[in-house]
């Protein structure tokens, strides 16, 4: 098949550089071998869909892709060198085990609370663990490497296509090189968390947008992929919206067939993007009786804390001097966007800048909510996105592009060899202390292994040993009995003799309150009900109000009084230093009043069709329900001021 070329004919008017289409007034004849394809304006104002919108030399993309191998190899070597699984990943592992055991995608058996905020990642792990005889821990590590590689390849192919269409020669993906040398990226390329899938989604979304704009086809599959972002991380709904908006602008441009169908094309893109997220949202409402994951409520994801968010941003930028390569990369993008704009390539500029907009909206959200307690983690999507369009072509490497390109290359070498994040020492640590940690280094130290991946590795840490002890305690509970363990000092060893009788319709043998639920919960097993003191997996605590800002993700700290009120046997004593009987009585009163009582019934009762339908209708009120973490205050709020305080 011959190479596609465009032979311009006489135009009826000068090129309109202000339109969003490319050379829409030029009528051309496309030659491919002995075949002639015409494109242009028909009488009546309709247009033929052109075979292609830009000259792309055959094989140009293949010839220019090889520089992607450099950042790809660097990031994979770094990720493997830093391979590990974060303690939080074991939350998903426990959910996967419960799912595969037939209990549903839940953290505590018998209680439908959505603790996983990354359902696509979690379900992918479940499928792979079912198909391949590999432990969940190593499945997550290997999947992370594959997704990271896929994200880098997709992003590299995207800029290679852009460079080939503009005849820039071999493309140097400086932005991907910039990302590949940052140690924070290496840590979360594995980690067992969903960040690698975010890289894959960003790279594929950019690549598909480039292909759609170039080929004037394939918009619906691209929209479906864009919509998947919300199933990887909730806040990616912002970036997904930007990508879908860009797709709508592209399909609304001339060159897509009959003009009268423009509205249907745009509607189709939006519908395709929303299809899977809407289906899952309906499932979430019917199954979990909520509009958002429990983790979103527990982390107060709608509250503002700009000052801490700024601190979190600087904590990521400063150790690697990221402001320097990002500023240089911005110059590269600005020079290219300006040149394309002047030639009338408005859609090309839109495609080029879409990843920048995705990164900026994600960055603003993360900073607005106060960031995270893990160094770099929540800023990596924005970093990867804004770096995607930062590239240079060998033929265009002149003038204003030379200095920024050399600067990024030199910085990359320095960052690769020397720039690392070292957290400052923390004095007087309390559960409410605000600090940003290097989670990998912390767990390397706690487990005594260079690569903490498996449950066996974590079993060497205090939390791992505690989980193993709880599993053993649960096995020794007499058949038909339930026990309750109240931990008043999370830093003290667990006392197996401190258990008290419990009663509940939930199928557990031992219930315990814990400040960390990942490794402990995973090793404790499904027979242990984990009452999460920080509310991620706590259907009561996640709906409490935030008294004051604390460490991001750890603001809703609730005491064991709610657990005693829900599962304890009235009249039994509690552990020394535990909540008073008055406080427990107030919590028990609050638990009996709607909407809290109705919500707990909705997520613990049998999931019949009628209950699923009722959950759909009640999910809004259940999601917006809030009350004080203080049981005495909550009793008045939930039961009404006419109820006397106990």
Model features per residue range: what roles?
Residues 1-60, 64, 642-646:
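Short, intrinsically disordered terminal tails adjacent to the first/last structured region
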Residues 39-44, 51-646:
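Membrane-proximal envelope and lipid/glycan-remodeling enzymes
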């Amino acid at each position: 098949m011959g190479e596609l070329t465009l032979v311009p004919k006489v135009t009826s008017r000068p090129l309109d550089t202000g339109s969003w289409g490319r050379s829409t007034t030029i009528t051309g004849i496309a030659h491919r071998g002995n075949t002639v394809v015409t494109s242009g304006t028909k009488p009546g104002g309709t247009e033929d869909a052109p075979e292609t919108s830009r000259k792309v030399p055959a094989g140009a993309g293949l010839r220019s892709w090889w520089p992607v191998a450099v950042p790809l190899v660097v990031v994979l070597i770094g990720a493997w060198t830093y391979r590990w699984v974060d303690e939080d990943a074991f939350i998903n592992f426990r959910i996967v085990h419960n799912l595969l055991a037939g209990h549903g995608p839940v953290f505590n058996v018998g209680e439908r609370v959505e603790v996983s905020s990354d359902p696509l990642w979690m379900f992918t792990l479940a499928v792979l663990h079912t198909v391949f005889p590999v432990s969940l821990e190593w499945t997550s590590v290997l999947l992370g490497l594959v997704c990271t590689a896929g994200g880098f390849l997709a992003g590299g192919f995207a800029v290679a296509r852009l460079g080939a269409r503009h005849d820039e020669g071999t493309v140097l993906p400086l932005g991907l090189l910039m990302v590949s040398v940052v140690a924070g990226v290496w840590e979360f390329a594995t980690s067992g968390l969903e960040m690698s899938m975010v890289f894959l989604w960003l790279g594929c979304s950019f690549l598909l947008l480039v292909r759609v704009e170039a080929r004037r086809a394939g918009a619906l599959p691209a929209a479906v992929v864009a919509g998947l972002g919300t199933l990887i991380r909730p806040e990616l709904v912002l970036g997904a919206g930007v990508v879908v908006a860009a797709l709508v602008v592209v399909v609304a441009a001339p060159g897509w067939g009959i003009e009268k169908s423009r509205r249907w094309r745009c509607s189709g893109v939006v519908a395709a993007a929303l299809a899977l997220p809407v289906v899952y949202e309906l499932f979430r409402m019917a199954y979990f009786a909520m509009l958002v994951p429990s983790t979103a409520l527990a982390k107060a994801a709608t509250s503002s804390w700009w000052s801490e968010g700024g601190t979190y941003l600087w904590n990521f930028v400063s150790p690697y001097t990221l402001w320097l390569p990002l500023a240089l990369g911005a110059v590269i993008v600005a020079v290219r966007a300006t040149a394309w704009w002047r030639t009338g390539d408005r859609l090309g500029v839109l495609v080029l800048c879409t990843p920048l907009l995705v990164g900026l909206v994600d960055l603003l959200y993360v900073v607005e909510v106060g960031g995270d307690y893990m160094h770099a983690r929540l800023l990596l999507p924005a970093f990867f996105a804004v770096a995607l369009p930062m590239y240079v072509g060998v033929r265009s490497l002149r003038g204003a592009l030379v200095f920024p390109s050399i600067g990024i290359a030199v910085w990359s070498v320095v960052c690769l060899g020397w720039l690392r994040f070292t957290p400052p020492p923390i004095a007087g640590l309390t559960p409410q202390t605000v600090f940003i940690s290097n989670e990998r280094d912390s767990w390397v130290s706690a487990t005594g292994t260079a690569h903490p991946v498996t449950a066996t590795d974590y079993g060497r840490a205090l939390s791992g040993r505690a989980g193993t002890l709880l599993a053993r305690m649960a096995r020794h509970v007499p058949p038909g009995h339930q026990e309750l363990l109240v931990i008043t000092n999370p830093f003290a060893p667990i006392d197996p003799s401190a258990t008290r009788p419990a009663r509940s319709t939930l199928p557990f043998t031992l219930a315990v309150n814990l400040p960390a639920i990942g490794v402990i919960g995973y090793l404790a097993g499904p027979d242990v009900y984990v009452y999460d003191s920080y509310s991620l997996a706590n259907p009561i605590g996640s709906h409490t109000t935030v008294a004051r800002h604390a460490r991001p993700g750890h603001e809703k700290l609730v005491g064991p009084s709610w657990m005693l009120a829900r599962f304890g046997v009235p009249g039994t004593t509690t552990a020394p230093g535990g909540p008073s009987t008055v406080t427990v009585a107030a919590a028990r009163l609050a638990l009996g009043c709607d909407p809290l009582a109705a919500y707990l019934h909705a997520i613990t009762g049998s999931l019949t069709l009628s209950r699923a339908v009722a959950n759909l209708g009640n999910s809004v009120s259940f999601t917006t329900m809030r009350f004080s973490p203080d049981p005495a205050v909550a009793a008045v709020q939930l039961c009404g001021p006419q109820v006397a305080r106990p």
